[in-house]
């Protein structure tokens, strides 16, 4: 399955007691299908993967594959700090039916660029799934350079990158690597429209958890080079882009999800949204239904 358009980095709904919320998860999956997204990511950073048990990981991924697998890509977050553990997690995701592995650069250990090349080649060779690279140095402490991506893009089982550095120069460098076999995806909602107009394939979004139709519309218009309409939609979504960054992801978007009846809480060490941001959350939540309705016209 091709990787393009809007892909939602799914949050993981929890109940008030901290347990998984299977009903909330099904409602979130339904919302994404209704919004026409082109793919989803299960158990990535937005999904609080670091807090999930193996059994919870399996439950989330298996139920997502059962509900929407075969229609759109179901990517699984499988990146861990060690190569052997990342391979093991990727094989686990493959056995559960994921279409791709989204593999973040190894957090905390700060490998060299040569180390990244060796790491990703090993995962691509042994993990059993097509690999999508994921660069988010603000979270991992490791910045994968475009030259490193260029070397990895030649591997037949490395099929794309999620680049969360919203720098224009970085996007331009990665555009040179884009091909039918290698997708370039933005991981930054706020700069995605501009990047898609420049030629990248799509967006892996946080805000689309609550506004799948609206973010899909923005991405489609950007890909069609309808500049005026793209600017209009990007402007409507700008308050959501900004709000999702007022505290570490996924705290803000989970506050919005809670306000539309999906999920209740986060897991430590993340805390609920600070009270100072509650008025903004209430205001934005009140706009969600109208924006989703408008996106279908």
From Swiss-Prot:
Catalytic reaction annotation: L-aspartate 4-semialdehyde + pyruvate = (2S,4S)-4-hydroxy-2,3,4,5-tetrahydrodipicolinate + H2O + H(+)
Q: Which InterPro entries match?
A: Aldolase_TIM, DapA, DapA-like, Schiff_base-form_aldolases_AS, Schiff_base-form_aldolases_CS
User: Which SMART domains does the record match to this protein?
Assistant: DHDPS
Q: Which residues does this entry assign to the site Part of a proton relay during catalysis?
A: 45, 108
Q: Which domain of life is it from?
A: Bacteria
Provide the GO biological process annotations.
diaminopimelate biosynthetic process; lysine biosynthetic process via diaminopimelate
Tell whether Amino-acid biosynthesis is among the UniProt keywords: yes
What is this enzyme's EC? Answer: 4.3.3.7
Q: Which residues bind pyruvate?
A: 46, 204
One GO cellular component assignment for this chain's record is: cytosol
- The principal localisation class reads cytoplasm
Enumerate the GO terms in the molecular function aspect. Answer: 4-hydroxy-tetrahydrodipicolinate synthase activity
Active-site residues are: 134, 162
- Where does the record place it? Cytoplasm
Keywords, ordered alphabetically: Amino-acid biosynthesis, Cytoplasm, Diaminopimelate biosynthesis, Lyase, Lysine biosynthesis, Schiff base
Which family is annotated? Belongs to the DapA family.
Q: How does it assemble?
A: Homotetramer; dimer of dimers.
Q: What does this protein do?
A: Catalyzes the condensation of (S)-aspartate-beta-semialdehyde [(S)-ASA] and pyruvate to 4-hydroxy-tetrahydrodipicolinate (HTPA).
Q: Which HAMAP family match?
A: DapA (MF_00418)
Protein name according to UniProt: 4-hydroxy-tetrahydrodipicolinate synthase
What is the gene name? Answer: dapA
